[in-house]
């Protein structure tokens, strides 16, 4: 059984126009605060060496408060300046795993979730994996699962733009892949995998700019979305000595997400086109170097260009260019009798790239972060005694 309390997190969004003489006219001045209480429990039961049954339950209690100093016209009948909502979310699942042979594993999961007073349909999933070769640990995997996602509180109520008419996403996903792992214990390890996936989602929830005289976004349901692609992952770890360790991880994704549903209007040209702000290609490489209690991490990311409109028009405002991102982090670990501690310093956007992830909203240049992590050793001393 585990539990935690997530700290209060705040976000702000301000949009103002310069009307001259140093005066600003605020169009939007929104503040959003949320925190979460969480409890989780799980158990497992073996029957011989071939059957394993597991059960898990996760309970979240979300609290969200949003205020806007500007009065937002949500519809023609009322005006709101924010919202204050709480929602209980419960997720329960049971899984049966069976190994009929030494090389073959099969499992079935049944999951059901509650959002407020609404229960989802039963959500099944089936998984299979087969050890092709013990040499190189070459393994084939496949799965079929049902998808169901309820709108978040921000999807429903965020000011400005929340949409209380949203319906849940639903659909099916299929994937298959192959993986390998080789190495020598205490010296090095090398692993990799390739996965193909194919998803068909009804009522995909997508935030889109409203356009016209409005300056904010609103989530809408897209009737039918086909998301598919290939993901490649690889990792290498090396013990340089007793005190030095080196690690390298990389991934590449090709992930088209195409609208296959109904047009929103007569002039809608989104059918058969990539969803706005969803990159088709992305990649990341992370390097790690550890010496005693010191940790150095370097991360490089790539995101391909993204369209800003459902028409996928190649115009000045119809897409945002690709960008590269470089981050570096240095961390020092400490250990006390009562807690494990770490101090971390990070440099984000190391080369001060000029880029945007959303049209017209420049992202920060080089910036710096400092973290202090404290993990109390509650009960550990007693357990040793």
What are these regions (language model features)?
Residues 46-52, 102-103, 133-138, 183-190, ...:
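Short loop/turn motifs that connect adjacent beta-strands in outer-membrane beta-barrel proteins
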Residues 302-311, 321, 327-385:
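C-terminal beta-signal and adjacent terminal beta-strands/loops
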Residues 33-37, 84-90, 120-122, 170-174, ...:
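Residues that define the transmembrane beta-barrel architecture of outer-membrane proteins
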Residues 2-14, 131-133, 139-141, 168-228, ...:
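Membrane-embedded beta-barrel scaffold of Gram-negative outer-membrane proteins
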Residues 1-119, 127, 131, 193-196, ...:
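Face-selective signature of the C-terminal outer-membrane beta-barrel domain
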Residues 3-11, 59-65, 88-90, 110-116, ...:
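Transmembrane beta-strands of outer-membrane beta-barrel pores
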Residues 10-24, 66-74, 118-124, 153-159, ...:
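Outer-membrane beta-barrel translocator domains and adjoining extracellular loop/strand segments
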């Amino acid at each position: 059984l585990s539990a935690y309390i997530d700290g209060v997190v705040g976000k702000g969004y301000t949009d103002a126009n310069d009307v001259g003489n140093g005066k600003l006219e605020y169009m939007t001045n929104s503040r959003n605060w949320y925190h979460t209480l969480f409890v989780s429990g799980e158990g497992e039961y073996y029957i011989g060496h071939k059957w394993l049954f597991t059960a898990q339950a996760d309970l979240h209690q979300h609290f969200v408060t949003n205020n806007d100093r500007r009065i937002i016209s949500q519809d023609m009948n009322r005006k709101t300046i924010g919202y204050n909502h709480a929602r209980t979310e419960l997720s329960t699942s049971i899984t049966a795993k069976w190994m009929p042979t030494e090389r073959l594993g099969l499992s079935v999961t049944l999951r059901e979730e509650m959002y407020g007073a609404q229960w989802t349909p039963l959500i099944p999933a089936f998984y299979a994996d087969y050890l092709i070769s013990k040499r190189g640990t070459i393994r084939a995997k496949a799965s079929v699962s049902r998808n169901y996602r309820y709108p978040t509180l921000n999807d429903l109520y965020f000011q400005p733009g929340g949409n209380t008419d949203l319906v849940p996403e639903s659909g099916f996903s299929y994937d298959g892949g192959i993986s390998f792992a080789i190495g020598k214990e205490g010296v090095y390890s090398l692993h990799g995998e390739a996965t193909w996936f194919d998803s068909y989602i009804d009522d995909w929830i997508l935030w889109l700019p409203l356009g016209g005289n409005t300056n904010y976004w609103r989530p809408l349901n897209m009737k039918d979305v086909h998301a598919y692609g290939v993901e490649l992952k690889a990792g290498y770890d090396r013990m340089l000595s007793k005190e030095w360790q080196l690690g390298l991880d990389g991934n590449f994704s090709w992930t088209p997400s195409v609208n296959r549903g109904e047009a929103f209007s007569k002039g809608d040209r989104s059918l058969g086109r990539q969803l706005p702000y969803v990159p088709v290609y992305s990649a990341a490489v992370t390097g790690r170097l550890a010496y005693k209690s010191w940790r150095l991490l370097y991360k490089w990311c790539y995101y391909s260009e993204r369209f800003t409109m459902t028409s996928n028009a190649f115009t000045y405002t119809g897409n945002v260019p690709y960008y590269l991102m470089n981050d570096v982090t240095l961390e020092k670990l400490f250990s006390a009798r009562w807690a494990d501690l770490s101090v971390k310093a990070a440099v984000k956007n190391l080369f001060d790239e000029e880029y945007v992830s959303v049209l017209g909203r420049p992202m920060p240049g080089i910036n710096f972060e400092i973290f202090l992590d404290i993990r109390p050793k509650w009960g550990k001393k007693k357990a040793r005694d």
